[in-house]
């Protein structure tokens, strides 16, 4: 069976063969299989050495101190630790938190949990259509009792980039902690934590050709950020995250981050051309809309709404392409994407969206093929749509009164 063209890199990426090779060296008796917390023999020392080297590799990509990297099981855990950890530790200083309506569920759900614990959350509305959360919005929402602002650097559905450097200046001036979810940003945009005033940052390995099940939380040392641990046990990771370290996964994450640093700029340039080619081609169709900011974005995403076409039907028609409607974390529900709804899209347009996301194995031939089959599928589905016929006849659908069955 021929495999479909993979255009869902925002959901996950395959492990780079070089990363897999490094990981394999840490699994069997011949390799570095020891427990990094075993301080009394060489097996433990060797594992610890690999873990600390990987910590340096991750820190180097984001220009941080290796001692500021805390290993977790992924960005979801990192987000939970950052939000609940800071909120619970500093609750006596204030109970107000700012986030936005278009964050990942790994931020929104902990916020709901904190609301139940008595915290007050302000959910910022993004700019219509572009999805930008601006420094001005944050400035207007900051209060003396705001202890934390949590915003993503790159949105996982539309690829819009938030100006976290400018927002960091505002939060630092207000003596407010700033957490950034950078799961979709690492390896795609430059991150310099030696200059950015960001206190906590979440990462995941599987978004940049590393393994699933491993991530990290950057926790600033100066000015110091303290957290209330959410997982208790052996006191690993300076007490912030207990649990035996998975050496092979950590080594994989370190290797993936190092490789990303070497290829990032050239790869963004290459992918930008592919994205533009697909978007330019899709605009041959009528009633096609770009979701997200036209320029302030990363090249890896193209989120498009095809009016008068149901996104689920379109996905089913694109058997040769692996794409998603909404994000993979919420695509189990048939609800329209809450991110696109927050951008002001109608239910119909939100339902008709497809997210194409590109990566290092995407070729120009892939784009040509996907463009051809997408155009054909949209045209075929519109032929079946009575709404499309009405639109073509010049009927304003917003004025139509639908009879109840």
Swiss-Prot record:
It is an enzyme of class 2 (transferase). Pathway: Cofactor biosynthesis; iron-sulfur cluster biosynthesis. The modification N6-(pyridoxal phosphate)lysine is found at residue 207. Its cofactor is pyridoxal 5'-phosphate. It is found in: Cytoplasm. It comes from the Bacteria. Pyridoxal 5'-phosphate binds at residues 75-76, 156, 184, 204-206, 244. Keywords: 2Fe-2S, Cytoplasm, Iron, Iron-sulfur, Metal-binding, Pyridoxal phosphate, Transferase. It catalyses: (sulfur carrier)-H + L-cysteine = (sulfur carrier)-SH + L-alanine. [2Fe-2S] cluster binds at residue 329. Its EC number is 2.8.1.7. One of its GO terms (molecular function) is metal ion binding. Pfam families: Aminotran_5. One of its GO terms (cellular component) is L-cysteine desulfurase complex. SUPFAM superfamilies: PLP-dependent transferases (SSF53383). GO terms for biological process: [2Fe-2S] cluster assembly. The active site is at residue 329. Homodimer. Forms a heterotetramer with IscU, interacts with other sulfur acceptors. Belongs to the class-V pyridoxal-phosphate-dependent aminotransferase family. NifS/IscS subfamily. Master enzyme that delivers sulfur to a number of partners involved in Fe-S cluster assembly, tRNA modification or cofactor biosynthesis. Catalyzes the removal of elemental sulfur atoms from cysteine to produce alanine. Functions as a sulfur delivery protein for Fe-S cluster synthesis onto IscU, an Fe-S scaffold assembly protein, as well as other S acceptor proteins. This is Cysteine desulfurase IscS. The gene is iscS.
